[in-house]
Regions:
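Conserved ATP-dependent motor core of P-loop NTPases, especially the RecA-like helicase ATPase domain
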Residues: 65, 86-197, 216-220, 235
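Structural preference for long, well-ordered alpha-helical segments in enzyme cores
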Residues: 42-50, 62-66, 70, 74-81, ...
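Conserved RecA-like helicase ATPase core segment
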Residues: 4-6, 10, 19, 48-52, ...
Length: 385
């Protein structure tokens, strides 16, 4: 299937940069796709091209994204595209063409646990706690612990909040409570070594030390909270990713099985993945496996919940070619959504970020939208805005 065939099949005029991403050889590569450049369209077309050219069968493709809504949208677009392929090219029913597996990152980790959790002593039928049940269990741990929490100076409700936050942050960064305690102990020693002169220059030192000591105390509580979940055979979302990461990194046979099952892996919104998610994925699919990550470093907005934009910046090192060399990086920069004036403003505002993340500025296509304009206003009320 050539470019013209695919354009006609999907009724989309693919640009050269889009076609380069769609028809790239099997192997690991990252697509840095700016806003409005057709990221989802390219991912859908990549699936169709791989199946149409018989590189892989549809059911050998794994696609991961973040939300159930995004999963449903990608599934619908891929299913519609494959239906066109089955009708117009293969002339066979869609159920004979097959469908890729598309899910959220957390659902994939949950599947991993269901199939392999016993390797870590985790029952396949473990229940995932609701938000309310998670808070309730944390409150039980806080009110029943033998540790002296008065040193924190928090109310029980506040302790529950910071406990759950720290538990999730540790899981998303792949850091154990023991590792956190070791870091904070060294940090406190370093600050003390800095001496009183430095303390006078930086008045925040005392507050920083207090926060560090609080983290050490809370890290013990995190262990009690996790133990309480294990005893009850329940887990939360942070457990899913942490246990999935452990299965991927500690049991090579799990990765071998999944690489045989999924010949191609597509990773959506990769700029918003966490360290734990990246370690799970590299544990399963690194070493030259055909992994395509798509994302935009300039749209990384979830660092507050553990996301690491370094994952997309360093993709070609985390997912090298089979010979160990760095994998390819492709770019989608042709914005088909906005006019030239809007793109000029966006590029101007993002200059420092683009330089930091090695991202090219957005450009208009051959047949651009109307130039448009930018208005800036500071209005006194939400209603007026």
């Amino acid at each position: 299937m050539n470019r013209d065939d695919l354009c006609r099949l999907l009724d989309t005029p693919f640009s050269q940069e889009q076609w380069d991403a769609i028809s790239a050889p099997l192997g690991p590569f990252v697509i840095k796709a700016g806003a409005g450049t057709g990221k989802t369209t390219v991912m859908t077309a990549r699936v169709v091209w791989l199946v149409a050219t018989e590189r892989v069968q549809a059911e050998q493709i794994l696609g991961l994204t973040f939300t159930t809504k995004a999963t449903a949208q990608l599934q619908a677009r891929v299913r519609s595209a494959l239906r066109r392929l089955s009708d117009e090219v293969h002339g066979v029913p869609l159920d004979e063409v097959g469908e890729p597996t598309i899910s959220t990152y957390h659902a994939f980790a949950g599947r991993l646990i269901a199939e392999h959790g016993l390797r870590l002593g985790v029952e396949p039928g473990s229940t995932v706690l609701t938000e309310a049940a998670s808070i309730q269990l944390a409150y039980q741990v806080v009110t029943r612990t033998q540790r002296d929490l008065s040193v924190l100076g928090y109310t029980p409700d506040k302790v529950v909040s910071v406990l759950r936050s720290l538990d999730g942050e540790l899981a998303e960064h792949g850091v154990t409570p023991e590792m956190l305690r070791a870091f904070d102990t060294r940090f406190q020693q370093d600050v003390e070594t800095a001496g009183n002169a430095a303390r006078r220059r930086v008045q925040l030192f005392d507050k920083v030390i207090d926060n560090s000591k609080s983290r050490v105390e809370l890290s013990h509580l995190v262990e009690e909270y996790r133990a309480a979940r294990r005893v009850r055979d329940v887990m939360d979302f942070s457990d899913q990713m942490l246990i999935g990461m452990q299965l991927a990194t500690e049991f090579p046979e799990v990765g071998e099985q999944l690489r045989q099952q999924f010949q191609v892996v597509l990773l959506d919104e990769y700029q918003d993945t966490s360290v734990a998610q990246r370690l799970l994925l590299t544990g399963l699919f690194a070493g030259g496996h055909p992994v395509t990550a798509v994302g935009d470093p300039l749209q990384a907005i979830y660092e507050w919940r553990g996301a690491s934009v370094a994952n997309i910046d360093d993709f070609n090192m985390h997912f090298p070619n089979p010979d160990g060399s760095r994998s390819r990086a492709l770019t989608l920069k042709e914005n088909r959504r906005s006019g030239a004036n809007i793109l000029d403003g966006a590029n101007s505002l993002s200059t420092s970020l683009r330089e930091l993340h090695d991202v090219e500025p957005l450009v208009t296509p051959a047949n651009p939208k109307p130039a448009g304009g930018i208005r800036v206003g500071l209005l006194p009320t939400f209603a007026e805005e």
